[in-house]
């Protein structure tokens, strides 16, 4: 707190974001609307979904994650790069976990080829657990029994609390870990990317959601300042955000290697970290936690923002009569 003015906190965003969207009359939620393709007509964008519906709007922002369909059509740059690790997740009632864990902090356990992160949610009533280990294959396929055996082997020398955490995992909730190399440009015309769709990163700096939130605020400012020129707005947005998010991606890879190192490499990392004091560590992270310098734009009043957003709101049209 003395260095960065604010404490490190964990926020369960799911319900907060959903409730905020439901309260906003200019937002329409369309569940189970899987996007199949889009068409940029230069004056508007049409988005087609797999169930045959078509939506039209002033622009399209693809915030559809690391396996973004928007990105696939926009740049056709292939799949994310798996790094050989698999992640397992679960959220359990805090009372179900009998081992002694700290209830008010984010905790990381790390070793050669594996790590576990756990932290409390909802005022300490829930415990979020993420366990990661290196596999011999990048495939997400495999039955629960096989994964259980691999986990037991990877964590065979781990602390008893780590083994107790492993017992709480839902092995059906798994995901191959990976990222993408940073890119300079995230848009073409009236279509842009945001968050993991633009700059997916490893979890070692815990900045995926934070970068997406910063993206959103920066993008809103750039659109508000561009007077309807979406190509210019998206260009200003990516210029403002590309270097910062690229650094997060590259530093996350570096930290990931430190987490999972072994042998003499691990000893070197220990020596390097041991040479740093608390103040040194904080200064090493200052570029990240001191915040992002947003573009200097005049933000419109909320009444003006609502009027502008209403003009840009998407409309649903008959797919058969839409422009293609």
Where are these regions (language model features)?
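Conserved N-terminal helical subregion
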Residues: 1-93, 136-152, 291-312, 323
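Short beta-strand or tight-loop elements
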Residues: 31, 43, 112-114, 173
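Conserved mid-domain beta->alpha element of the FAD-binding
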Residues: 61-62, 88, 118, 151, ...
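A short coil-to-beta-strand element that immediately follows conserved catalytic motifs
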Residues: 82-84, 101-105, 126, 149, ...
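Short helix-loop capping/hinge motifs at secondary-structure junctions, enriched
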Residues: 94-101, 138, 225-226
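Active-site substrate-recognition segment that forms the wall
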Residues: 104-139, 148, 155-156
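Active-site lid/adjacent beta-loop-alpha segment flanking the redox-cofactor pocket in flavoenzymes
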Residues: 131, 136-153, 181-182, 201-206
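C-terminal helical "tail/cap" subdomain of flavin- and related membrane-associated enzymes
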Residues: 206, 221-324
